[in-house]
Amino acid sequence: MSLVRRSNVFDPFSLDLWDPFDSVFRSVVPATSDNDTAAFANARIDWKETPESHVFKADLPGVKKEEVKVEVEEGNVLVISGQRSKEKEDKNDKWHRVERSSGQFMRRFRLPENAKVDQVKAGMENGVLTVTVPKAEVKKPEVKAIEISG
């Protein structure tokens, strides 16, 4: 399956739709910007399990490692949060389109019982955050051979 980004001006599905209630809704709801919502929604995170660990990967383009927090809360809950800062604007700038998001994001994951939460490691490279949570070794049941008399 391939995904094709639509960028054709003549394609009605690639254009932003006008919403007559948009301005009414914005005047009633307190000031939260679309960018704040988009930043929260754009914190995409993959979680895979290997035989040794649970690995989380988050695409955080444009976010510095100082702007990201990785924590483990009570109850084996991994929390990845941060903030994507806005660029400084010059009053003479004229924006034609703003698609990159800024604002805060937070994601929570309940870790399984076998997670070693005291040994979590995190690293960031090229805008990708990798969090590794080691798993406790599963004790193999000890088998004791019983001699049969008789």
Swiss-Prot record:
Entry's induction text: By heat shock.
Protein name: 16.9 kDa class I heat shock protein 2
Matches recorded under Pfam families: HSP20
Protein species of origin: Oryza sativa subsp. japonica (Rice)
GO cellular component, one term: cytoplasm
Family of this protein: Belongs to the small heat shock protein (HSP20) family.
Domain of life: Eukaryota
The keyword Cytoplasm belongs to this UniProt entry's keyword annotation: yes
Domain sHSP: 36-150
Gene Ontology MF: a single term: unfolded protein binding
Quaternary structure (record): May form oligomeric structures.
Tissue specificity comment: Expressed in roots, stems, leaves, spikelets and embryos.
GO biological process: protein complex oligomerization; protein folding; response to heat; response to hydrogen peroxide; response to salt stress
Keyword Cytoplasm set for record: yes
Cellular compartment(s): Cytoplasm
UniProt KW keywords: Cytoplasm, Stress response
